[in-house]
Amino acid sequence: DYLKMQKELYLFIIWQNGRFMEKQIIADLRKKFEIFRIFEVSWKEENFALNLARFYGKKLPKGCKKEKETGAGAFKVCLVYDNNPQYADGKNANIVKSKQDYRQLTGGGNLVHASDNLAETNENLLFLFGKTVKDLEQEGPRAEICVVRRDLVGCPVWDSLQQALDTVRKIPFTRVKAYKNSYLIHSRNADLARRLLNASSHFSIPGIHKYSIEVGKTRQPIYIRKIN
């Protein structure tokens, strides 16, 4: 029994067009997992496509007219504990199976999203709320549904440079230091740092890539370097 995993936090999203099966899905989640928190999130309609593309990154399902498919209205985010994760190929098979079941239940498309492993839960939470798994665990479970009306972090722009840096620092194995009147972000997860910052590329010096991010009404240069 020494191989028994510690319980881990996972995230399911029921997009607007899948919510006709919400009661059945949440009832099934309660049976299989331990419900930690449920959020109802709304994004501004004009930012929905941007938010979605950024949330999925390169993983936007192929040939999926994503926003038309998901619907651009309020969606449910269910955070659950799996008390006995079963890993295969870096993914928790319990979660993958449930996600596939719920996608079938909602008509076979991409109307339900789930994080495949703890790292993806963390990434999803950073984009949605600017918080890590640890941050949410420290806040503790809540019975009531939490209503959140806001876009992904840094959408359409960051409120301040400090907000952007504080958020990117939450990525594992990431450091921020002053560099050339700006900041250099060293990260093992450099691509995630770029996506989270919503940074657009300028040019690259070997090993260091210069980007810019939108802060208020200005563009701020920022450097990102991948470390191993």
What residue spans do the PLM features occupy?
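Non-catalytic terminal and connector segments of soluble metabolic enzymes
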Residues: D1-L152
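Short acidic donor-binding/metal-coordinating loop in glycosyltransferase active sites
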Residues: Q16-N17, N181-Y183
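A generic structural signal for alpha->beta connector loops
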Residues: K32-I35, K170-F173, H202
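Short Gly/Ser/Thr- and Asp/Glu-enriched loop/turn motifs at secondary-structure junctions
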Residues: G73, G107-G109, K177-N181, I208-K210
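Generic detector of bulky aromatic hydrophobic side chains
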Residues: A93-V96, K134, R175, I185-N189
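A residue-level structural signature of the nucleotidyltransferase/glycosyltransferase Rossmann-like core
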Residues: H113, L184-I185
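Catalytic core of pol beta-like nucleotidyltransferases
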Residues: E139-L165, P172, A178, I185-N228
